[in-house]
């Protein structure tokens, strides 16, 4: 039985600590988007088999199994269970792949899949960071700062600061063009606050330039090449999708936009975690029975310019087919929500462009990569 994505929606992605969602609880914003998605598809909430929610730091306001909390805040009945997944940056792509595998095995027919992260309200590494002392001393790479991994990749592959800045500028230019063309309108669900609604992403910088980027100091190491401009910003946001069987979609008047053909998760050295998409993409191609030339477009989450550049080069991708509307450097990277965004964005782009096949992929902290192969229905 094939698993299909029938619709998706996301909140605006806004800058942590100073953006429009900094004062909104993550469970609240996730509940609002889940409710919006169900209402616009006129689906009976009781028909949802499970809510699968990705979250990189599931504690504080994101704790106590936020997947189950969203059952209540999203207006679903108590009969619908909920679970929280943590594969760091790949958490909500994992939720989609888990739903797809359940559908293919006959263990369910309709799942609400997504993720959420408030990087304003739940700090990176959580509230009580406590690494294993022996592992930290004997293999410190296991806990390496993500910015250091970006520097490592840049050094290993000879990616200059200027090349990283050109990549970042292109991401902002693509996202600005998409914003002006209204390409984000259908995917955005406004978030209601007591005094206003948040309607629009606020990480995109239409005014940015190579000249302005050139003045920024290195962000992670003295004399390094990675800056704030060539890193994805700390971001608040949430994204959800409806993943169901083709049979369920037909019976309930839902229109599939893409089928989940295959998924893959691989490991890599943690201090080079940004290279994870290379092996994950190679494996998902193998499982789908495709060649790289069979794929019409790619969504590659841009954690950093350096790792994105190397992934594009190593996989032999045409840059014109990658991140048509920009990536996380421009749009933002709320950790637990990004996997759902890139997967569903790839599905939507197949409809918009008339393409047949897409791959969504991303790197994962700790040294992993994840990828999903999609085919237009």
Named regions from a protein language model:
Residues 1-26, 211-275, 279, 286-287, ...:
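Condensing-enzyme catalytic core mediating Claisen C-C bond formation in acyl metabolism
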Residues 21-90, 94-111, 116-132, 188-200, ...:
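Conserved beta-ketoacyl condensing-enzyme motif
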Residues 26-42, 66-70, 95, 146-153, ...:
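Short, well-ordered amphipathic alpha-helical segments that serve as non-catalytic structural scaffolds
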